Amino acid sequence: LPFNPLTKLEYAKDKGQIPNAVYQLIIKRFHIVADGISRIEKASGLDYPSYYVEPSLVITTSKVEDGQFGIFFARTVPIIGEDNHLNFVVQLTAPLIAYGLVGSIHAILAHELMHYLSLISRVLKMNVISEEIPESLFEEKYRDFEHLLEARVIFKHDRSLINHIDKKFPEGFTDPRMEEKVLEHWMNKHLPTTILPIDANIVRIPIELMAKLQVDQVIREKIIQFENTKVRSKKSSDYV
């Protein structure tokens, strides 16, 4: 699914939705994303899925936690392509690239590959996702963690990357420095913000579309390999 990952960002800048200074900052730091993807591909032996930069801050709220919100710095979402075929694309938010440290950006990129592989695995097994809608952000974090493949299996050739994931995802993504910068330089300046309901990060796919997911044989074989590899303990938790 070839496309320019910066198209939506460029459109937002041209429409005056994103200040030129912020746009230039993201462009200047975009090499961190490119470097991270190359690193992840080398460590996993897989091509990274299609991705794009979402020119907004994406936050989520729940009905039972008044005044509280969580930030989605990245998401892996299903898309319907040509001939009604199912695919997945990674959405990276502009604030992540603008204000994230290298370790945080690389950890999140790696985490989204873990999401991508887990979603493909579940679709291939025709595992219809019809779970209960989580009632709180806390429940959503741990629900997300339940389904992911092991980072130490997927990225076993890059111990430093695994350490980044373990550090940034102790029990859900945490980076107070980046979160403060995002609030100060993005949210408080009223730059584009998208508010999603808490269940927006639950992927629901009709079974007829599952049958139309085209998966490269290399990915199929890698998923089987990852799933059959045992590790001593599960340390890294996973949520963006």
Which residues are covered by each model-predicted region?
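Charged, helix-prone or intrinsically disordered regulatory segments positioned adjacent to compact structured domains
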Residues: N4-E10, I26-F30
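Acidic/histidine-rich, surface-exposed loop or edge segments in extracytoplasmic proteins
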Residues: L6-A21
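Conserved aromatic-histidine-acidic binding/catalytic patches
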Residues: A21, L25-K28, I97-I105, S130
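Zn2+-dependent metallopeptidase catalytic core
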Residues: L25-Y52
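Long, charged, glycine-rich C-terminal linkers/tails
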Residues: S50-T61
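Active-site scaffold of zinc-dependent metalloenzymes
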Residues: S62-G103, Y116-L124
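Metalloprotease/metallohydrolase-associated module, dominated by Zn2+-dependent proteases
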Residues: G103, V123, N127-V240
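Short alpha-helical catalytic segment bearing the HExxH-like zincin motif
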Residues: S104-E112
